[in-house]
Amino acid sequence: MHCAACDYQSSVIAGTIFQDTHLPLTLWFRAIWYITSQKNGTSALGLQRILGLGSYRTAWAWLHKLRRAMVRPGRDRLHGRVEVDGTFVGGEEDGISGRRRGDKSLIVVAVEVEGKGIGRIRLRSIQDASANSLHSFVVDSIEPDSTVHTDGWQGYKGLEQKNYKCESTVIGKQRKDAVKLMPHVHLVISLLKRWLLGTHQGAASRAHMAYYLDEFTFRFNRRTSKSRGKLFYRLVQQAVTTAPAPYDQLVQSRKSTSSSKPQALGVT
């Protein structure tokens, strides 16, 4: 685009995730269609192979740019009855067990309970299971006056002061206890772990875990959609309203978090 008055030149893809791309938009659209048409998504290696991209780095960057566009800022919060719990996902370190999980990512999950079924979900990678981290997640993800059901971990205490109705169920050390007492959130946790292991072979790094969580949330919250075309349209729509992210910005989080490890407290 060219402004005759000031001689300024711009592009229709400026300010979008497509900005500065050297490959045709039709290839981007093929990537979006493939990603949204696959039930479990794809890995960067799979996308490189399907599109015939010459570089794994390009496929990796495209996937992360699209994941950034999958979750809208300011989206509606969960409401009603919501189960909240934490879990660890990702890699392990030899000789580390119990509550210190090395390079694993600490994830907090919130799930709307609709009768015997599940509504929408929210997920976040957090540094620790402190009240500050957990309260911030709840406030950002769940509407006040909702009923928040947790496992009784001390980090959830005080949510009543933020206008939440709180229920806590003390859960034993056995995983089967958690699954029985809080079935909805633990079903989502199980599906998340299966997806990370199956589609990405467990290779999602802690530095970039937020992007993978955004993709899982995008897919899960649209799981009942019968039209792949609507998913394609939605992702394209959000891609053109998402700010560009150069490759260096995408990898920066890896450098800045490589020496830090999550402080795991009270999650199973």
Where are these regions (language model features)?
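Residue-level recognition of single "structural anchor" positions
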Residues: 1-268
